[in-house]
């Protein structure tokens, strides 16, 4: 191919390595619900699709509500998510205890549990494994991956991109996609 990834550091070493690893789709607005649910659903087969273990663990997502405000907000989110077709629900403190036996469900404790938003198909995944899996798949498709190579400038001629200046030299190109967090 004539595609290259130019990475200032190493694959997975930037913001990718500092995310929460929670795979979920519990957002309030319809556009966010749709894109995050699509993303979440892709994780169910991503290891097979990329032939790389993403270490996806569909253990569910539970957002505890410890104030009336949190409970109302999560209930609103739950309703919006259910209307969008997501598998989620509000659960009682007893159901929280059944799913997570170690939790303190004493109503007189400092932060009592009033309920929880529960998304059984949410989970966790290894962010580094995801980055490396995609990189390996890109490499197998012929994408050049250039690590430890800082882009220092984009050259233009007559308003059109003609190349990149990098810490490892010049790269001639007509198109540039910038992906940064």
Q: Which stretches of residues belong to each language-model region?
A:
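Glycine-rich FAD pyrophosphate-binding loop
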Residues: 1-17
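Hydrophobic anchor at the start of a short beta-strand
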Residues: 2-3, 88, 176
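Short loop/edge segments at beta-strand edges and connector loops
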Residues: 7, 92, 147-149
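Short beta-to-alpha linker loops that shape the active-site pocket of alpha/beta-hydrolase fold enzymes
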Residues: 9-11, 96, 134
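Dinucleotide-binding Rossmann-like beta1-alpha1 core, especially the glycine-rich loop
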Residues: 20-102
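A short, glycine/Asx- and small/polar-enriched loop/turn
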Residues: 69, 99-113, 155-162
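Helical element adjacent to the flavin cofactor pocket in flavoenzyme catalytic cores
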Residues: 117-175, 179-180
């Amino acid at each position: 191919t004539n595609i290259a990834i130019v990475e200032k550091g190493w694959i997975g070493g930037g913001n990718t390595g500092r995310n929460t690893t929670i795979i979920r789709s519990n957002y309030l607005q319809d556009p966010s619900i749709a894109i995050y649910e699509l993303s979440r659903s892709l994780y169910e087969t991503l290891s097979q699709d990329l032939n790389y273990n993403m270490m996806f663990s569909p253990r569910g997502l539970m957002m505890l509500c410890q104030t009336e405000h949190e409970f109302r907000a999560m209930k609103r989110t739950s309703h919006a998510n259910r209307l969008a077709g997501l598998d989620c629900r509000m659960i009682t403190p007893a159901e929280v205890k059944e799913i997570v036996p170690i939790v303190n469900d004493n109503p007189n404790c400092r932060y009592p549990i009033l309920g929880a938003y529960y998304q059984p198909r949410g989970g966790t995944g290894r962010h580094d494994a995801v980055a490396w899996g995609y990189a390996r798949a890109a490499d197998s498709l012929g994408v050049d991956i250039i690590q430890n190579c800082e882009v220092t400038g984009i050259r233009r001629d007559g308003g059109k991109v003609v190349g990149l200046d990098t810490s490892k030299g010049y790269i001639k190109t007509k198109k540039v996609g910038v992906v940064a967090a």
